[in-house]
């Protein structure tokens, strides 16, 4: 998707968020099995690209699933790989959204624009806090967390001990359920592949799914090159 296309989408979403403040992000890509449990609901349903996410929505991916999400205030992105589960939350303050991702398990890439608001990913083991960076986070409730720094600095804190480390480009932070935390050089083989890095040429279309006041769903279709 080109930059002009994203500008059009984001302009529309910023307008939408002004009307409905709990709308915080839009799903830009879905591959394989990806499901959503909307905030206030108890059941999962299929997630489609173009869906608008609200504060508190829960997303999970199947073994080969993948989802890409862009926040409407600053174009920060999240990418969830297979076997991942996360709750997307955001609190609006003036022109920005303070974002927190509660992640139970899986693999996620976060590319965060420099901002005044906070961005936090919390797992059962750790808390990762950033302001403008690019990193992978792999979490397992039994084994703990690995944060792989691609750009900028990530502050990684172990919940059990309260100890923290800074993770920079080329380094990986390790945090375990028993309280151990440290930093080591990243092995190239440990960096996950990003499915969205592959180029997909040719004209296409993007659908945005909107819900009316009576619960009916409408679809806005945008053609792009």
Predicted regions mapped to residue ranges:
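Glycine- and acidic-residue-biased ligand/ion/polar-headgroup-sensing regions
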Residues: 22-41, 62-66, 82-84, 88-91, ...
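Short coil/turn motif common to extracellular beta-sandwich-like domains
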Residues: 24, 55-56
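A short, solvent-exposed beta-strand micro-motif common in secreted/extracellular proteins
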Residues: 57-61
């Amino acid at each position: 998707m080109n930059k002009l296309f994203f500008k059009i989408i984001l302009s529309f979403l910023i307008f939408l968020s002004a009307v409905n403040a709990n709308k915080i992000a839009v799903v830009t890509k879905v591959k394989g099995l990806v499901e959503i449990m909307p905030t206030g609901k108890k059941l999962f349903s299929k997630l489609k690209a173009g869906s608008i996410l609200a504060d508190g929505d829960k997303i999970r991916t199947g073994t080969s699933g993948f989802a890409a999400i862009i926040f409407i205030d600053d174009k920060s992105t999240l990418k969830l790989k297979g076997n991942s589960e996360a709750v997307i939350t955001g609190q609006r303050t003036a022109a920005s959204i303070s974002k927190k991702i509660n992640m139970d398990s899986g693999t996620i890439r976060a590319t965060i624009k420099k901002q005044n608001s906070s961005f936090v990913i919390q797992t059962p083991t750790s808390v990762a806090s950033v302001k403008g960076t690019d990193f992978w986070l792999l979490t397992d409730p039994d084994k703990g967390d690995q944060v792989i720094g691609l750009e900028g600095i990530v502050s990684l804190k172990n919940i059990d001990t309260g100890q923290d480390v800074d993770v920079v480009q080329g380094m990986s932070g390790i945090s375990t359920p028993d309280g151990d935390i440290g930093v080591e050089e990243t092995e190239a083989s440990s960096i996950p592949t990003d499915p969205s890095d592959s180029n997909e040429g040719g004209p296409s279309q993007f659908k945005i799914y909107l819900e009316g006041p009576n619960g009916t769903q409408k679809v806005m279709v945008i053609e792009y090159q």
